[in-house]
């Protein structure tokens, strides 16, 4: 081991032993280039450090290894095991002094396992990393997006769904606080990507909910992504907008309400999503055949955007919506008539749709197998059972909790010095913009 690396080890040991973690965290970024240049002997450095006692020192060695991964081509299993050991054994107290480096390490690790087609091996590791670094279960961190990406690549959603189901009440601002430091130490330029990882979390989250057919929640995630305040459009927001339009049709049969203050949508997104707006317009005609033609017409564009599967779900939703319309008009109808009226290929296909809709609670009906007649029924729920009462009570409690959280967040904003300064500044601007009246006569006139 060279003298420079020996100095690194001694520095880590000395400052860690004295509990000078802040000082160590401020000095270690300067050693990152040194560690990266000596990537071939970094395992020797790790042998002299303890993951629990010297977590900051091990973190930067791991970060250097991941920075060098593209050129060094390390053994994937060995590097994955090292990352797994680190997130399981590190000292969480020390990590608080180098959150940006920890985030960057997780981002690079995610890129590495995705490139090696080993995404499934990274899911539990990044999940553990999130649990370590977040301060609340409802806090969003930049590495939430990494967990979503790994889950999408691996097509495994069991781990990520509990994170997505938690409504966000706080966003990690540690990376933002590091930006001043980043101007001096450019090694952690990734910390400037707060907005990108915020958008990616809601974009990937919407895709995951779409994959598990939780379309209501998917619509909410895409809506957050496209309505995030922005002066210019990002590619992430554009792709989310395309999916937002299609999921809107599945959930509501039309474009879901979009706040008027999202000017970036009308100015930039709509002109770049013409195919999707054509799809919306045709859907409004309730003609399954016309919808099939428009999907076929734009199949190349939908496939290029990885939205062809979603387009097929839109077509399926129109068949279902047209069947639901029949329940409001007819009491009984033959399967062949159902197929004819909703433009399905056969009575067998109509029966399959109706049975699936009965099973999912989308309609209430029964099929007489002898004569092939469908009997449409009213909703059997009378809303007077103990279970329904308990459900209403739980919903009320949930809403009241949300109201309390919103009031708390509003109070924090109102008391924020930056907000107060900006609000007072706006009032001063309003006062100065009102030109004083020029008095040529009686000032009371």
UniProtKB/Swiss-Prot annotation:
Keyword terms: Cytoplasm, Developmental protein, Differentiation, Nucleus, Oogenesis, Signalosome
Broad class of where this protein is predominantly found: cytoplasm
Ranges annotated as biased composition (Polar residues): 433-445
One GO BP: female germ-line stem cell population maintenance
The PCI domain, residue ranges: 217-381
Compartment(s) where it occurs, according to its Swiss-Prot or TrEMBL record: Cytoplasm; Nucleus
Region Disordered, residue ranges: 426-445
Keyword Ion transport set for record: no
Gene Ontology cellular component annotations, sorted alphabetically: COP9 signalosome; cytoplasm
PROSITE patterns referenced in this protein's UniProt entry, alphabetically: PCI (PS50250)
Gene3D superfamilies (UniProt xref): 1.25.40.570
Described purpose of this protein according to its UniProt entry: Component of the COP9 signalosome complex (CSN), a complex involved in various cellular and developmental processes. The CSN complex is an essential regulator of the ubiquitin (Ubl) conjugation pathway by mediating the deneddylation of the cullin subunits of the SCF-type E3 ligase complexes, leading to decrease the Ubl ligase activity of SCF. The CSN complex plays an essential role in oogenesis and embryogenesis and is required for proper photoreceptor R cell differentiation and promote lamina glial cell migration or axon targeting.
Family: Belongs to the CSN3 family.
Subunit structure: Component of the CSN complex, probably composed of CSN1b, alien/CSN2, CSN3, CSN4, CSN5, CSN6, CSN7 and CSN8.
Name of the protein in question: COP9 signalosome complex subunit 3
Gene encoding the protein: CSN3
